[in-house]
Amino acid sequence: MTATAPITQDVMTLPRKLPEGGPLNIVGLTREELMAALVAAGTPERQARMRMGQVWQWVYHWGVRDFAQMTNLAKDYRALLAEHFAIVLPEVVTRQISADGTRKYLIRIAGGHEVETVYIPEEGRGTLCVSSQVGCTLTCSFCHTGTQKLVRNLTAGEIVGQVMLVRDDLGEWPERGAPKDETRLVSNLVLMGMGEPLYNFENVRNAMKVVMDGEGLSLSRRRITLSTSGVVPEIARTAEEIGCQLAISFHATTDEVRDILVPINKRWNIRTLLDSLRDYPRLSNSERITFEYVMLDGINDSDADARRLVKLISGIPSKINLIPFNEWPGAPYRRSTPERIAAFADIIYKAGYASPIRTPRGEDIMAACGQLKSATERARKSRAQIAAETGL
């Protein structure tokens, strides 16, 4: 019997309204929500769909933040919009740029809370890693975010806002009247920042509806990857309601080790998780599932682990991303040696699976995989203390 996923309803997202009595922030509203809001503000129902489409394109295609600039709308209608609505994004507190070009943004959201967003430029593409929660409930022992307690879920607007802020910083909004440029600086999006996306399903789903909309931010679902530690009851919903690529934060080949590295395994173990994945490619029209596997020296990197991994995922269209562990202050683990990682990858490759080794990016600014944590929450524990807590 499958358990219901705990969607942390005890940690409610803040409403999209500005201070009491203020206008409604439309960033993150779905098309249906925006149209209903326009009607409630006095837009005639027969015009609502057209007006919604016009506002949508101004906000998400052109990046406009001022209703007065929406020049294909009548002046009195622009005034009505300004009276009832606002276009408000989170605030960039700091921006750090790594020696390799990676950018890390510390972003302040409603309530003064902070999350981190990372932009990774690569040859021919640019990947944006966004956060879905302030902190995390999962306490994965190798992950820096897991040492920060969950504060709250992000709203759909706060998730979409991360994309818009980075496009601001990169100057990626099109210029009206200029020739069309198909180059995309933000071409890929990964939900791999702070938090477990499937513990904030509704807001993540609604945010992705905005991000994937062809008349706005227009990122293809094939270029969006959601990474989950294994919230089994929400995996089928992800396929049906979002349909993006799926990555599994796997990291171990036995329940004994995964219970420690990824404690959610105690609720949904390896077999239960893998059984839930077999239909995902068909339901979502995805080619394959990505298994993420962090390489920890002496913990999960043996030849036996590699052979078990291949056996476990047999029958699931997949690839395995091997991630050299990115250390953070107080981390209880060390990165596997390059030779050990290469030997592990070779076993997987010879079994017929792609096994790329991820090149760490942004390590010098603590922006690499597993290193994100709100700057105001960087409480440092000693390596011995965390090792004692995890039992390794």
Swiss-Prot record:
Q: What else is known?
A: Reaction proceeds by a ping-pong mechanism involving intermediate methylation of a conserved cysteine residue.
Q: Identify the GO cellular component terms for this protein.
A: cytoplasm
The primary location reported for this protein is cytoplasm
- Amino acids binding S-adenosyl-L-methionine: 195-196, 227, 249-251, 326
User: What is written in the cofactor note of this entry?
Assistant: Binds 1 [4Fe-4S] cluster. The cluster is coordinated with 3 cysteines and an exchangeable S-adenosyl-L-methionine.
Q: Which organism is it from?
A: Cereibacter sphaeroides (strain ATCC 17025 / ATH 2.4.3) (Rhodobacter sphaeroides)
Q: Which domain of life is it from?
A: Bacteria
Question: What EC number(s) has UniProt assigned to this enzyme?
Answer: 2.1.1.192
Describe the task this protein carries out. Specifically methylates position 2 of adenine 2503 in 23S rRNA and position 2 of adenine 37 in tRNAs. m2A2503 modification seems to play a crucial role in the proofreading step occurring at the peptidyl transferase center and thus would serve to optimize ribosomal fidelity.
Give the reactions, separated by semicolons, that this protein catalyses. adenosine(2503) in 23S rRNA + 2 reduced [2Fe-2S]-[ferredoxin] + 2 S-adenosyl-L-methionine = 2-methyladenosine(2503) in 23S rRNA + 5'-deoxyadenosine + L-methionine + 2 oxidized [2Fe-2S]-[ferredoxin] + S-adenosyl-L-homocysteine; adenosine(37) in tRNA + 2 reduced [2Fe-2S]-[ferredoxin] + 2 S-adenosyl-L-methionine = 2-methyladenosine(37) in tRNA + 5'-deoxyadenosine + L-methionine + 2 oxidized [2Fe-2S]-[ferredoxin] + S-adenosyl-L-homocysteine
Q: Which UniProt keywords apply?
A: 4Fe-4S, Cytoplasm, Disulfide bond, Iron, Iron-sulfur, Metal-binding, Methyltransferase, rRNA processing, S-adenosyl-L-methionine, Transferase, tRNA processing
Location within or outside the cell = Cytoplasm
Q: Where is the active site?
A: 116, 369
Question: GO molecular function: any one?
Answer: 4 iron, 4 sulfur cluster binding
User: Any S-S bridges, and between which cysteines?
Assistant: 129-369
One annotated GO biological process: rRNA base methylation
Q: What is this protein called?
A: Dual-specificity RNA methyltransferase RlmN
**Similarity-based family:** Belongs to the radical SAM superfamily. RlmN family.
Q: Which residues bind [4Fe-4S] cluster?
A: 136, 140, 143
